[in-house]
Amino acid sequence: MRRREFIKLSASASALGLLPSEIGKTLEALNGSVNCDTTNRRLVLIELKGGNDGLNTIIPMDNYSYYKNSLRPDIHIPVNSSNYNSLVVDSSLSGSLQDLAFNPALLIGNNQGFKGLYNAGMLRIMQSVGYPSQNKSHFASIDLWATGNDGNSWDNGKESGWMGRFMENAYAEVFPTNYPFAIQMGSNNTWLGFHAEHEHGLALNIEGQNSENFYTILSGLAGQAPTNIPNTHHGDEINYIVQTDAFSNTYANSIETAYNNGSNYNDSAYYPDTDLSNQLKTVARLIRGGIETKIFLVTIGGFDTHNNQNQSNNDINGRHTELIKELSGAVDAFVSDINSDSIGDDIVGLTFSEFGRKAKQNNNRGTDHGEIAPMFVFGKPVKGGISGNNVDLNEANSNNNWQIQTVQYDYRQVFSTLMQDFLGANDSVIDKTFFDH
């Protein structure tokens, strides 16, 4: 794979048949990232667990009448002459195939949330992200995203995750370390994406801001290691736990030190009191405190909105809106925090979800499992803008169960480009991470 601009098509990706439109324009990308020192760079991944409704997150205005009257008469996001100017993503694109409006909830935050990030040139909207042969099971699709596979390559290295493979190949020369290469927050279940083929990082579930809990949680993992581990899949899982346990006390010390040395900028004014906000606040504090962890994964759940997506017909308030508000407020505060000093120069964040929702509402004021969904990439190093055209709503019909299936960007292109162009991975590492495993 040759190094390209952000999400430029690689030789390996071409072999997968991925030919998305406008690929050459996408985040040319990470401003000034190429050939620069990558030592302090970090990725912050935000998982929108449950399958986010992309159509009600960023609204396609080029076919709004069909969206409102035919597909979603009861749960559409109202956009009209009175609020269009405040919700439009980019007024210079009005009337084009990239004419989008933000869900009003994405304006939540001291700096107007995602709208403020876009206006400041720090938000890239990736349209129609997915993978070939989309699986609509939560568990299966989450595992496919975690292992770097798609619906056609289910068994291709499914015992390890792309994050784990990336870390053990990119940082082999410095392993082991006294800090985890990746930290997970907001979920009791360790994400499969952290599982490597040989070495293992440490995923943590950290809630709130109690520094004393860090050492207790980690050191509490210690115990007598089992012997006579079988050479089976079950044995591999035991080995993973044993290796993680071996590093737990060392990791506990480094995390405790970083947390105590770190701080948040004016957190009382910027951070809402929400679970996602507390996770991101902890990430910022650990980074400012000197932790050298490369990848952070935080989670917000509840996006499986089969019913009561809004409170009543034609009312935007409801389950989905509250989730988007939490996302916008937390990211707004996090970006304000990290940009209060120089650490924001080396941090890129992005959102992802295991799949999207159907284009047509169901009979319960909700939406059922779909396929493609947008991703948001944000931070100072990001070149703002929109990648890809609006979804073609006419693609969804009764013959395909109201699905929008055209993938403009494969999720592996997004992640592999960040690994290469931002974290500095070479061709060999990228191929071992996503294609040769």
Give, region by region, the residue ranges found by the protein language model.
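Loop/turn elements at helix/coil->beta-strand transitions in domains of secreted/extracellular proteins
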Residues: T39-L43, N119-R124, N178-Y179, I291-I295, ...
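Structural recognition of the beta-strand scaffold that forms the well-ordered cores
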Residues: L45-E47, G54-T57, R124-Q127, F181-Q184, ...
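Solvent-exposed loop/turn segments at secondary-structure junctions
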Residues: K49-G54, G130-Q134, S187-L192, G302-T305, ...
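Feature marks hydrolase-like catalytic cores characterized by long aromatic- and Gly/Pro-rich stretches
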Residues: I59-N63, R72, H76-F102, T305-H437
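Anion-binding catalytic surfaces of enzymes that hydrolyze or transfer phosphate/sulfate esters
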Residues: N228-D332, D337
